[in-house]
């Protein structure tokens, strides 16, 4: 298997070159073998996307925890993400097997790198002069000497996002933080806002969620962090309505609009242009306020 023009293709046996045939899950009558084959391919894709983050879009690795113990993990950022005063885009994926740089492994395998990875978001942000930092919230433990050990600062997704905020984003020069959070990533951001509200409010300009699974209940509605999120955020949800059409939203919740697709995993890709238009509008409002 290899990627050709961003799409996974099977190699032709006769030529060794990529053909027209895409990934096939069923390569054997043994269901367990097929699953192991799929998971092994997923592991290769993770490393391939990591390489693209460094070679194609020029990101660098930052350790988690900051002073690496064993075990440890890493996030990715543009070289000047922590020192530039330009807007800083934070990307937070959902739960499951995805790692930094991915929105949906199934899309990478069955559709394309464009729809399944965060690379289009990174390229768009860099084109607009923004810095970028992407989290890696699903790498929570490592096996060392046969024993699974939790990673300090990354024992679960919520802890990972909190650690990255406290140790990297909070001290970054930029006070124009823009967040994109997909699915469970939205829950992580809600928890971050609740835990770190003073610094969150001082740095965050806008939050774009894509089919977020968070929940702001009525008991939260009067809390400051919930009010801030409801004003500064928008949630693009899977829907059969046209892109950006308003969806029903409970009182006190983050406003919901259509992502222009009924597929959960496609929401981030489908609403990319709308997300950046939302960010630009939020930045303009901030700049006008600063000029007063």
Tell me what each language-model feature is.
Residues 61-142:
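Short, surface-exposed "cap/lid" segments of acyl-processing enzymes
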Residues 1-72, 84:
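N-terminal targeting or regulatory segments adjacent to alpha/beta-hydrolase or S9 domains
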Residues 86-89, 176-178, 206:
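Structural motif
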Residues 16, 81-83, 95-97, 139-140, ...:
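Conserved beta-strand elements of beta-rich interaction domains across eukaryotes
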Residues 116-119, 123, 127, 137-175:
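Alpha/beta-hydrolase active-site loop
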Residues 101-106, 137-138, 145-147, 191-195, ...:
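Short coil/turn segments at secondary-structure boundaries
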Residues 179-189, 207:
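Gly/Ala-rich beta-loop-alpha elbow adjacent to hydrolase catalytic centers
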Residues 196-292:
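The feature captures the conserved acid-bearing segment of alpha/beta-hydrolase catalytic domains
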């Amino acid at each position: 298997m290899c990627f050709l023009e961003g799409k996974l293709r099977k190699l032709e046996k006769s030529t060794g070159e990529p053909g027209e045939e895409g990934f096939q899950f069923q390569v054997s009558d043994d269901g367990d073998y097929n699953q192991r084959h799929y998971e092994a391919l997923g592991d290769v894709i993770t490393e391939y996307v990591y390489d693209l983050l460094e070679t194609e879009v020029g990101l660098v690795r930052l350790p988690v925890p900051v002073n690496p113990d064993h075990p440890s993990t890493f996030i990715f950022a543009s070289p000047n993400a922590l020192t530039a005063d330009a807007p800083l885009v934070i990307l937070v994926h959902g739960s499951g097997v995805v790692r930094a740089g991915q929105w949906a492994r199934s899309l990478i395998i069955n559709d394309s790198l464009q729809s399944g990875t965060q690379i289009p978001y990174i390229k768009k942000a860099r084109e607009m002069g923004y810095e970028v930092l992407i989290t890696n919230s699903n790498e929570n433990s490592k096996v060392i000497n046969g024993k699974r050990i939790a990673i300090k600062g990354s024992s679960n997704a919520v802890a990972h996002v909190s650690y990255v905020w406290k140790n990297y984003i909070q001290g970054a020069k930029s006070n124009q933080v823009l967040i994109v959070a997909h699915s469970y990533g939205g829950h992580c951001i809600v928890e971050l806002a609740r835990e770190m509200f003073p610094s969150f409010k001082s740095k965050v300009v806008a939050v774009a969620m894509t089919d977020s699974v968070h929940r702001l209940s009525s008991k939260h509605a009067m809390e400051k962090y919930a009010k801030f999120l409801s004003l500064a955020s928008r949630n693009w949800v899977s829907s059969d309505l046209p892109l950006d059409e308003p969806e029903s939203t409970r009182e006190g919740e983050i406003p919901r609009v259509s992502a222009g697709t009924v597929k959960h995993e496609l929401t981030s890709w489908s609403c990319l242009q709308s997300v950046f238009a939302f960010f630009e509008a939020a930045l303009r409002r901030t700049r006008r306020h600063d000029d007063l």
